[in-house]
A protein has these predicted regions:
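Active-site neighborhood of glycoside hydrolase catalytic domains
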Residues: 163-239
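Non-catalytic C-terminal accessory domains or segments of carbohydrate-active enzymes
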Residues: 338, 344-912, 916, 922-964
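The substrate-binding groove and active-site-proximal loops of carbohydrate-active enzymes
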Residues: 59-72, 96-115, 150-170, 189, ...
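Catalytic-core region of carbohydrate-active enzymes that cleave or remodel glycosidic bonds
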Residues: 120-123, 127, 218-228, 243-247, ...
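N-terminal carbohydrate-binding accessory modules
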Residues: 18-90
Length: 964
């Protein structure tokens, strides 16, 4: 539809822990007296309405992305470009302290834990950063980001206890200095810094502990942080808000979880035994985004962070007990970086509209109302009014959970008076879980939309015309009016009516079924300004508009050439709208591409697109080898190198007083990750018939018990139980005989430490209590168990694999020996497969070489390992650890679930060469266990313009002389 030569309106049809900062109708404004705040720099400033970046008022549309959950630095740019393509301009990120200071005093942020590649990728994509290093982060990671050795700190965590503060100093000094170098003042992408995280309540006085918060702030400032400090209260309680004195930040914000998840909200975490992330996504999907994201924007939110935008993976034991390996989160970008979820496209519509609507930052939010702007009280409308720059009205169902359709009309104030809309008659429609932005007096280039009920994706001022992309739901009637008279021309396929007058032109149309979701196909890449991907401005920068690709990563103009980086998942026609004057050549992914120019001035082309047939190896056909990974129960086993459990007291307040003669808590001996084994010795009285054992490993953990080589039984796990007391029947023992008790258990991470004072993170992992006795001999003393020893990851906090970090390896025999690394010593193994399994309880480690030959230079082909779970209910329970090239990338629990598919990113997997696959099988009952099926799967290939992915070449097997 062409209006005169000045407006080109393209009609299209479209169809959750987060940070919400600066809501202008909440009790706490961004800052009470911003003009009186002493700034340490002048590039990032603010007032009571928004941030300014280099003097430009900016709405920050942000998504959460944790680099530690994607240990392939060459993939950071891929994720950043996908976020930038949505119209977002910022990313928030946590740093996991536990990964960079596994041993007290030894800070290591190199290799895959280095932040410099993350900062570089953000800059290359044109994305600003909000840094959130804690020291406490929550984030559904083990200990909430606290390293396990903090269990030995006597002082209360997240307070001004001197030993706790001292423990944080090394980390905060080092990580603060790294982030400081990446601040915008040094040419980097970091524009905001958050000290601490969700510090919102406590079970200990005083609260808030202002001395503690000020200490964390001082740590950041001493490290060189000069950008504004922000807060994220768990709820709008005002903790640390500007004007509250010691411990106050510059900018106050709070979390918002509309659906009540502990998980503003881009998805949800999912616990062991949960429903799976695809089900989480259904609850917090594109419809959720339409309603709740727009509601936040209508409230005047101007720093808006979606948690998560990309979740990633809890690889290498980094997760907490209430979450499994996947941290997909039901986010807009899948764990494997695929962007086929509709929420991705819906958020793109919203963010792109905000980017071309800087006037919304000058508007004043009003209260949600019924019966004011619409006579239908089933519709609530929230106004955002401005005397200068346009008005915004967000319409939603009064009952936001309503799923049926509601018809309504509106009465909206305009510069020509209050108008009843649609003026041509008819009804607007709210279809199910939906909300809409209606605008009045909205500027588009040199023109003004008097009003529009259709939503706006973007607009662009061109030479001699202005392009506006509008959209509405299938079958919906919409109407817009342009101020000033102009001629109307439209294509014959457009179903519309219009009316002209001396003051305006009114256009009404109905979105048709053949245009369903076509708005999702539009991309608005920001044109580089010089070498800067940030473009000409933050709000409404110079762009072009591209229609038709799976993804448009970037666009630039050099001389006469328009260059576009795009990805394709199918053959398509590509349309380029807004090629600059003087441009005559089109390059797509580095190839000059011919095009046809339409009557409207757009370019149409058909890029060369083809897709390979992906052939993956059958994992059953690999040359598998196996080794017993529980030699500890054999009579000949030598445990002389084990750590003696000889602490008769503990500094852990959550485990005090001890119920055992010596501490059997893993962290008391430096074992903070993965499986642990315990061995104790006793002389039998001959009448023992019960072993009562109390263990603690976090929700869904398991434990198995042997006396010598006799299997007593297992606790196979429960999704709700972090600690359990199990009574095991003991077979007849020979009086005077010496026996060895062996306990194998897994730790699924430390608890988070959300409430200061509870010290939940210090809940110990290990054996809490035991009693070996005769149940029929009342009052008799239990049999003493002595000479306790404990085994965890080799070296404990002096962990062996510095490359893969302090959490990747647990304490099983194959892990201590390094057999999970590439090129293990197969001469020590025997031929066996996980599909055949074992006949009895125990642990077996299987390994095989996996060769791949995929066209990775041209195609992005996400891969995943899938365990067959079809017989999990009837089959014996087992647990499996999945290792890929030395990285632990899966914890499979057959009897609890829900995860059966484990994505492994390219870079961890070598898509063009040799890989080493490892699977440990822990059979939890006497019937043994086998893996019914394990397959390597792929998503459909995407023809990609991303940068080459570098293979993470970690250390291969080398004999560990101190292994046992």
């Amino acid at each position: 539809m062409k209006l005169s030569h000045t407006l080109l309106a393209t009609l299209a049809t479209p169809v959750a822990q987060g940070l919400t900062l600066g809501s202008r109708n909440q009790a706490y404004s961004i800052i009470r007296e911003p003009a009186k705040k002493e700034l340490l720099q002048d590039l990032i400033t603010w007032d009571d309405k928004s941030l300014f970046i280099r003097g430009e008022r900016a709405l920050m549309y942000s998504g959460e992305f944790h680099p530690f959950r994607l240990p392939v630095p060459s993939l950071y740019l891929d994720v950043f470009q996908k976020i930038r393509a949505m119209g977002f301009n910022m990313v928030s990120f946590y740093v996991d302290w536990a990964l960079v200071e596994g041993k007290p005093g030894e800070f290591r942020a190199d290799g895959i834990f280095s932040l410099e590649p993350f900062f570089k990728a953000a800059t290359e994509a044109g994305v600003y950063l909000l840094a959130r290093p804690g020291p406490y982060i929550n984030a559904e990671v083990s200990g909430g980001g606290y390293p396990g050795w903090l269990q030995r700190i006597k002082g209360i965590l997240r307070t001004d206890a001197p030993d706790y503060l001292k423990a944080t100093d090394n980390y905060m000094a080092n990580i603060g200095a790294i982030i400081a170098k990446a601040q915008i003042t040094n040419g980097g992408p970091v524009i905001l810094f958050q000290p601490e995280n969700e510090y919102s309540g406590a079970s200990v006085s005083p609260f808030p502990n202002k001395k503690y918060m000020q200490y964390v702030i001082d740590q950041a400032r001493k490290a060189g942080i000069v950008v504004p400090l922000i807060d994220n209260d768990s709820y709008p309680g005002g903790t640390g808000a500007p004007g509250t004195g010691e411990g106050e930040v510059d900018i106050y914000g709070f979390d918002s979880y509309p659906l009540g998840f502990d998980c503003f909200q881009g998805g949800s975490y999912d616990p062991f035994g949960g429903y799976g992330y695809d089900q989480c996504y259904k609850l917090v999907n594109h419809e959720f985004s339409r309603v709740f994201d727009k509601n936040n924007l209508a409230a005047g939110v101007n720093i808006f962070n979606i948690y998560m935008i990309f979740g990633g993976t809890n690889w290498g034991n980094l997760g907490h007990p209430n979450g499994y390996t996947s941290y997909d989160y039901g986010a807009s970008i899948r764990e494997d970086r695929y962007i086929d979820r509709e929420k991705y496209s819906q958020m793109k519509l919203e963010a792109q509209f905000m980017r071309v609507s800087p006037s919304i930052l000058e508007a004043t939010p009003g209260d949600p109302s019924t019966g004011v702007y619409s006579e239908n009280k089933d519709v609530t409308i929230t106004p955002m009014l401005s005397n200068k720059t346009g008005n915004f009205f967000v319409a939603r169902h009064t009952d936001y959970q309503r799923r049926d359709s509601t018809s309504y009309t509106v009465k909206l104030p305009t510069s020509l008076g209050t108008l009843s809309i649609p003026q041509f008659g008819g009804q607007l429609t709210l279809s199910g879980r939906d909300s809409k932005f209606h605008v009045t007096d909205y500027p588009v280039g040199n023109h003004t939309l008097l009003y529009s009920t259709a939503e706006i994706l973007t607009w662009k001022k061109l030479d001699g015309q202005t392009v506006v992309i509008m959209y509405g739901g299938q079958g919906e009637l919409h109407e817009f009016a342009l101020q000033n008279a102009m001629d109307v021309h439209h294509s014959s396929s457009s179903q519309l009516s219009y009316k002209q007058s001396n003051s305006s032109v009114i256009v009404q149309f109905t979105a048709t079924s053949e245009h369903r979701n076509s708005a999702y196909n539009y991309w608005v890449p920001v044109l580089h300004k010089g070498n800067s991907a940030y473009g000409s401005s933050v709000m409404n920068p110079e762009t072009i508009i591209v229609n038709g690709a799976y993804l448009v990563r970037s666009a630039s103009v050099g001389g006469k050439t328009v260059s576009i980086q795009a990805d394709f998942n199918q053959t398509t026609t590509l349309e380029v709208i807004g090629a600059p004057k003087g441009a005559s050549e089109l390059s797509i992914n580095g190839k000059i591409t011919s095009y046809k120019k339409t009557n409207e001035g757009t370019w149409l082309c058909n890029p060369e697109i083809s897709f390979p047939t992906v052939k993956l190896p059958n994992l059953r056909s690999l040359d598998w080898h196996a080794i017993d990974s529980l030699p500890e129960i054999k009579p000949s086993y030598d445990d002389s190198r084990w750590t003696k459990a000889n602490h008769t007291t503990t500094t852990n307040p959550k485990g005090t007083p001890l119920k055992t003669p010596v501490s059997l808590y893993g962290s008391d001996y430096g074992f903070n990750t993965g499986n642990m084994l315990f061995r104790g010795s006793f002389v039998a009285a001959g009448n023992e018939d019960q072993l009562v054992l109390t263990t603690s490993g976090g929700q869904a953990y398991a434990a198995s018990v042997w006396i010598n080589q006799t299997f007593l039984g297992s606790f196979a796990g429960n999704k709700n139980w972090a600690t359990v007391i199990v009574t095991h029947a003991v077979p007849q023992l020979r009086a005077g005989g010496r026996y060895t008790l062996t306990v194998v258990m897994d730790s699924l991470g430390f608890n988070e430490n959300l409430t200061p004072g509870n010290d939940d993170m210090k809940a110990p992992r290990g054996i809490l209590d035991y009693k070996l006795h005769s149940s029929s001999s009342a009052g008799s003393d239990p049999t003493p168990i002595t000479d306790w020893k404990i085994a965890g990851n080799l070296g404990g906090e002096d962990y062996k694999d510095k490359f893969r970090g302090p959490l990747n390896e647990g304490g099983l025999f194959f892990e201590r020996s390094g057999f999970h690394q590439p090129l293990p010593p197969l001469d020590l193994f025997s031929k066996a497969t996980p599909f055949d399994g074992t006949a009895g309880a125990g642990i077996t480690y299987y390994t095989a070489k996996l060769d791949l030959d995929l066209p990775a230079d041209e195609y992005d082909i996400p891969l995943a390992f899938r365990f067959d779970n079809s017989s999990a209910i009837a089959a014996p329970a087992y647990r499996a650890l999945l290792y890929v090239n030395g990285f632990q990338y899966g914890k499979y629990i057959s009897n609890i679930g829900p995860q059966t598919e484990f994505p492994v990113p390219e870079g961890i997997l070598n898509h063009n060469g040799e890989n080493w696959l490892g699977v440990s099988v822990w059979a939890l009952d006497s019937n043994g266990a086998k893996v019914p099926g394990l397959t390597l799967t792929s998503r459909p290939p995407v023809l990609t313009s991303r940068n080459k992915v570098d293979f993470i070449q970690g250390p291969s097997y080398s004999k560990r002389d101190d292994a046992f």
